[in-house]
Amino acid sequence: MIDSESLIPVGKLVATHGIRGMLKLHSYSGSVESLCTCDSVILRSRDGALNRFEPKPVLPRPGKFLIGFKGVDHIDQAQTLVGSEICLRRDQLPEPEEDEYYWCDLIGLEVATVEGMALGVLEEIFKAGSSDIYVVRGAGREYLIPAIADVIHSVDLEMGRMLITPLEGLLDL
């Protein structure tokens, strides 16, 4: 049985590629190093079902990655996997560097300013150029917080809290 609590999403299968079962992979981190060294991955389908697959070597292409799976040799088989997230067990991933976090560990954190103003809950993260953007929602507002050292004061995963020092005008938008 697959323990869904220990899984970390590392990418999403966004489209088929060719007729031989290859898929286009959007990597959440922009890297596929961990996928290249593992002997199995878990695919979480759009309906939440979890299935184990053995990946074929990942192929880098301009602006994307291509991946295939053993037993998936035709476009019709691959099409059923489009929209699935590729997940790895936490023990298949490297430990994050100091002041680095996996996105899944940040989602759900309470976010406040260092002065104590509660902003809401970190609900989404997306890449924007050289930094990530944290989407924080609360009290009928949405804040887009850049994940840069000048703004992120501290992250306490055990307490479930992030403190920020907002740049001038950041909270006025």
From Swiss-Prot:
Key words of the record: Chaperone, Cytoplasm, Ribosome biogenesis, rRNA processing
Domain PRC barrel: 98-170
Disulfide linkage: none
Cellular compartment(s): Cytoplasm
Molecular function GO labels: ribosome binding
Primary site of residence: cytoplasm
InterPro entries: PRC_barrel-like_sf, PRC_RimM, RimM, RimM_N, RimM_N_sf, Transl_B-barrel_sf
Entries under Pfam families matching the protein: PRC_RimM (PF24986), RimM (PF01782)
GO CC, any one term: ribosome
Biological process (GO), any one: rRNA processing
Assembly, per entry: Binds ribosomal protein uS19.
Record comment regarding domains: The PRC barrel domain binds ribosomal protein uS19.
Family under the similarity heading: Belongs to the RimM family.
Role according to the record: An accessory protein needed during the final step in the assembly of 30S ribosomal subunit, possibly for assembly of the head region. Essential for efficient processing of 16S rRNA. May be needed both before and after RbfA during the maturation of 16S rRNA. It has affinity for free ribosomal 30S subunits but not for 70S ribosomes.
Name listed for the protein in its UniProt record: Ribosome maturation factor RimM
